[in-house]
Structure formats: C-alpha cells, structure tokens
Amino acid sequence: MERPAPLAVLPFSDPAHALSLLRGLSQLRAERKFLDVTLEAAGGRDFPAHRAVLAAASPYFRAMFAGQLRESRAERVRLHGVPPDMLQLLLDFSYTGRVAVSGDNAEPLLRAADLLQFPAVKEACGAFLQQQLDLANCLDMQDFAEAFSCSGLASAAQRFILRHVGELGAEQLERLPLARLLRYLRDDGLCVPKEEAAYQLALRWVRADPPRRAPHWPQLLEAVRLPFVRRFYLLAHVEAEPLVARCPPCLRLLREARDFQAARYDRHDRGPCPRMRPRPSTGLAEILVLVGGCDQDCDELVTVDCYNPQTGQWRYLAEFPDHLGGGYSIVALGNDIYVTGGSDGSRLYDCVWRYNSSVNEWTEVAPMLKAREYHSSSVLDGLLYVVAADSTERYDHATDSWEALQPMTYPMDNCSTTACRGRLYAIGSLAGKETMVIQCYDPDTDLWSLVNCGQLPPWSFAPKTVTLNGLMYFVRDDSAEVDVYNPTKDEWDKIPSMNQVHVGGSLAVLGGKLYVSGGYDNTFELSDVVEAYDPETRAWSVVGRLPEPTFWHGSVSIFRQFMPQTPAGGRGFELNSGSNDVDAGYHRLPQNPEELH
C-alpha cells in the first residue's frame, strides 16, 4: 500500500492568536516593559503606553506618530480636553477590546472616543444612549448626537421625538429652532392623529414669539399637509387666522388645499409634492382600487378590491350593485369612483354609478345624455369628461348634471383619454382607418384640435394612457413597451419596458408611480401580476399580485381611511381637550358637494 505524498505546504491558523497577542501586550503594559510614550491627560495625570498599540487602535494616534509632527518623536504627549478617567477607559480598550459603558460615562466617553477616533467605542456609547432616551432628554440627546456626528443616536432620537411629539411639554416644543421644527413637520413619521395637530404645533411655535417668528410662518405652513386638514377646520381656523389672511403665500397654500378637497387639483399631473401625501399615523392611505373585469373562465366580476401599498394587503370594498356588462369606463373624481355606460351585448347603458369612499357605498347619479360603450373618461379641473367617437359630454358632481360638448373633430374608434396641463387628450385610430392620431380639447373654447406631435410610435391599437408629473405615458396593449410624450416640450421618449405584457390589463397612477395589473402575459396565460414603474429610478418592479388573475378590469387610486399606523410605544399628538379646534370624529376627506361649496 502506497503512502500518500508528503504535503509541500500545511496551512495553519491559530484562532486564539489575536486574543493571546492582546493579553501579551496587556501584560507588558502592566509590567511597564517596552513602553515608549507617555500620554498626559487633563489635570496632569500620566498614562504610559506603547506607540504601536495606540497607532493600531486609533487613526488619531497613527497620524500623530507616523507623521512629521513633534509628537512623533516626543516621549511625552499632552492631550488637551480629555478627562483622565476617559483616557484610561480608551487605553484599556486598546489593550483588551473591552469597555464598560454606563450612565455615568456614556456621554464623556463618546466625546473622548470621537476626539481620539475610537469609532467602535463611540458606536457602543451611542447604542447605550439610545436605550436611555426619554421625554426629558430626547431633544438634548438629538443635539448632542448631531454635534458629534453620531448618526445612529441622532436617528433614534428623531424617531423617538416624532413618535412622542404629543407628550413633549409646551416649553420643550416652543424652544425648538426653526430648522428642527421644519424637519419634524416635513417627516412622514410625525405621529399625529389628524393633520390639524401638525398645524397647531406650527402655530403654537410662532405664537411663542410672534415678532421674531412670524416671518417664518409661510415656511412652516408649507410643511403642514393642509389638503388633509378637514374642510370645517380650514374655514373656521386656518382661513380665519390673521397670520394666514395677511400672507399671500399662505393664501395660495390654503387655495391649493381647498382645490384638492373639491377635486379641482390633479395631484398626478403635478410634480411630486409631500403635501399631497397623508401621514401614516392619520390612518389615511392612497390605495389602488380594482373594479370589475373577468376571471379565467371569462365570467364577469362584480367585486371591488383595494390594495394598500403601505401594507401590501388587499381588502374587499362594497360590491358593484348591478350588472356591469362590458365596454364601461372607470375614473376617479376626487375621492370617489365613477363607472359610466357599457352594455349587456344588446342594449347600451347611459347609467352612471358613484362609489362614495367615505361610506363604502355605491349610488346611482344622473345618467349620461347619451348611452354609450367603449368610451373613455377622464377628469379635468374637477369635472368628469366622457369621450366617444361621435360625442363628448361633461359631468359636474356639484350639481349632479351633464352638459353636451363639441364632439371630436375627427371621430376615433376605441380611444383612450388623459388630462394634462389643463387640456384633455384623446388617442386612437381614425374611424374606419388604421391611422393613429392625438386630439386635444380646450375647455376654455370648447374646441378640439389635431395635435401635431411628429411621428407617433407604431401602435397597433390605442394604448392605455395616464398622466404623471406633466408627462403622458402610453402603455401598449400588445407589447411591454411604454412611450412618453411631453406636451410642453413636444418631445417623445421611451422608458424601460415592463417585465411582461398586460394584454387587457389595467393602468393607474398611485403614489407617484405607474401601476399596471393583470391581463394576458407573454405566454397568453391570464396574469395576476401587479408591477409598478418609478420615474425616479426609471425601473419596473413587481409589487404584488391580484386576488385572482383578471382582465378587462378598471383601476384607479383614491384616499381611504384605515387603522392609523402609530409606531409601537407612541401615543401621538394629544390635542387640548378643552379646545374645540378638532373633534374626535371620523377623519375623512370631504366627499359631498355640499361639503365642498
């Protein structure tokens, strides 16, 4: 039997070597052997040490001893501003890798570790101080953390303050610097039960020192999310506040809030704006609502499902009360959803159904002037427009009435519409032809015109279209390609393709992103995929799944009340119980015309 060949190399590693080396160095220090430098702390106390150990433990000492400074050769080095007991702890850490952080030494030790560049000790002190945060010290702790660039502690203090803002004393809040208060008001995590509380916080701060702080009021009011302050409070308190009434920028913010609540503000057409995003603590969330469609067996669905992107969960809403049929159109007007027209295969519908999100109920409203199917509907300046090949009409929810408008100059088959920059755009093929065109409606003149926007993309069918941040997005129904048109610059662009095709799927805008759902995929299988496009990253991602594979459904986004998302341990903002400023009622956006006018 042959013996194995001897190894040319035997790799060996002693896992205990590092610890053994530290112990050996500590022993040499205790025996005062090979010491080559003495550190002099504040008060004149001496600490003999080894240069090599200090340089290996701290970039501060490495730079000191390796450079051309006098200290690189000196036998004694004076350290200004370092308490002896803190230097003792840091030296012990250099030789052992251990330090005991306590309530008595955490802050001075962090200061010394920051000065002498012991990042691990500094981080340990910050972690300890995070556990000591309370109502009495959280504001000072945030100041301390930011002064010493302790990001973990600063972030923890910020979260604690936002979570417990309602429990902080009036004196604590009123002495906040402007920049700090603005940071809190702008943060999604500010824990208030209603946005009125954020307004009161800003107003209380200004009233604590009106002569010096009143000039900052427009900045503060801009950080408050006025669109989600209830209408009666806007009228009774915000509009009546002298600081608002005498300030044009504040009046513009107030007008914006009222337009939003009256459904005259298209948040999708504008650029990203934090004021149009409710705080999670208020329980209000922007959701994706799916209406109707067909399942894998081509059976008609009357279910209405909503998807909350904050939780990733689906919930049922009130079912559609009637037979939807086919060829209907769905649109969101303010915080309500409207379903118009359609047919049962033999009869066209002129009926219009409205979903009231505040009471989770469908009701029938005034019928259209003309029954129709395979039309398109969009909202422009708070009015609902219905566009078909041979007619256009407009609905005013305040008066529950329809008005006939000029039809398109060139009739189009199966067009899709979107509102952008104060105009209504219709995209489709000319009736009886394959030529694709875009027409534009001007509500001021009640006239349609052909849009000369150069060579259109090679669409086989009218694409689904929505507006986001002043751009019109066209999602093709027979491919994963997506085109973009900028009407202001008259420019075309193409964004990355979707992960799959969505033939017969649905398109909506939610939270500043495009959401495409359902339809048939590349393999002609009915899909339940929901994917979203983020304009900031220019990327598509799968964000969820439909309750079941669906096609020919409609989707829109609205705001709806859910259970408030209050972080654990946070009570949120407690309003003065003696004040009539805010009631404890159900927080919702105004829904009914009588509430809006």
From Swiss-Prot:
Compartment(s): Cytoplasm, Cytoskeleton, Spindle
GO molecular function, one term: ubiquitin-protein transferase activity
One Pfam family here: Kelch_6
Keywords of the record: Cell cycle, Cell division, Cytoplasm, Cytoskeleton, Kelch repeat, Mitosis, Repeat, Ubl conjugation pathway
Domain BACK: 138-239
SMART domains the UniProt entry points to: BACK, BTB, Kelch
Major localisation: cytoplasm
Gene3D superfamilies: 1.25.40.420, Kelch-type beta propeller (2.120.10.80), Potassium Channel Kv1.1, Chain A (3.30.710.10)
Subunit note: Component of the BCR(KLHL21) E3 ubiquitin ligase complex, at least composed of CUL3, KLHL21 and RBX1.
Name listed for the protein in its UniProt record: Kelch-like protein 21
